Regions:
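Short acidic, gly/pro-rich beta-turn/loop elements at beta-sheet edges
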Residues: 60, 137, 202
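A short, solvent-exposed beta-edge/loop patch
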Residues: 154-231
Length: 231
């Protein structure tokens, strides 16, 4: 039986829990662009660093698909935390991730979902919202830079999502073995990454997205097993 609980998205995570969480970040944070281990701040610098990409926003270990995992992400989020609602038939929420620390807050959010591929077999979807320059979505897409890069939005959009009752166009980014779409919502990049690439047919129709930071909504969210696609 899939665990389901009604969700009031007002965060209820204790401050002490966040203290434990950031202790984990210090030990295991990685670069959002390449997933190499990140070097923690020192007495001389408050910045996290990657040996390849320099100063970064640290990516914490994936959070389990649960109410606690969701509330922990929403609590510190400075960017949207986006979930398709209603969920596509048969799909479950399968985990969360975020990039940021106590000083900056969460500047990139990732929500993972798993379900049936419209063309057959299983599929996974990561929805990432991030400030420009963070690089989590671009890293998953296999792009060399932190953002979509040259040529972005130079053609007609390939798909559309609806956020807060406003349509947001998305463009397809070339990527091996997966379908990657990216657009802009409220000055943040929004990436939808789907495995396998045939699961991109899920976006043949506009996909409505909810920002889970909105404290007025109550959603009965179904949780599944943790998705291995989460970085």
């Amino acid at each position: 039986m899939t665990p389901r609980r009604a969700l009031c998205v007002t965060p209820r995570v204790a401050v002490t829990g966040m203290g434990k969480y950031f202790a984990i970040v210090v030990m295991r944070a990685v670069c959002p662009r390449c997933q190499r281990p990140a070097r923690a701040p020192t007495a001389w610098s408050s910045a996290w660093r990657c040996d390849l990409h320099g100063e970064i926003c640290p990516l914490a270990p994936a959070r389990l698909p649960s109410m606690d995992g969701l509330h922990a992400l929403v609590r510190q989020a400075r960017v949207p935390v986006l979930l398709p609602w209603p969920l596509p038939p048969g799909w479950l929420v399968s985990g969360f991730a975020g990039a940021g620390d106590e000083r900056t807050g969460t500047r990139a959010s990732a929500v993972s979902l798993s379900g049936p591929n419209p063309l057959g077999g299983p599929a996974d979807l990561l929805i990432i919202a991030e400030e420009p320059g963070i690089g989590l979505g671009a890293g998953l897409a296999g792009l060399p830079g932190p953002d979509p890069g040259d040529g972005f939005a130079s053609s007609q959009p390939n798909a559309t999502v609806e956020v807060d009752h406003h349509d947001a166009p998305l463009w397809l980014v070339e990527s091996d073995g997966k379908a990657v779409f990216v657009g802009e919502v409220a000055a943040n990049w929004v990436w939808l990454v789907l495995w396998p690439d045939t699961a991109g047919t899920l976006l043949f129709e506009p996909l409505p997205l909810r920002d889970l930071r909105d404290p007025t909504q109550e959603l009965d969210v179904p949780f599944g097993a943790l998705c291995p696609r989460l970085p």
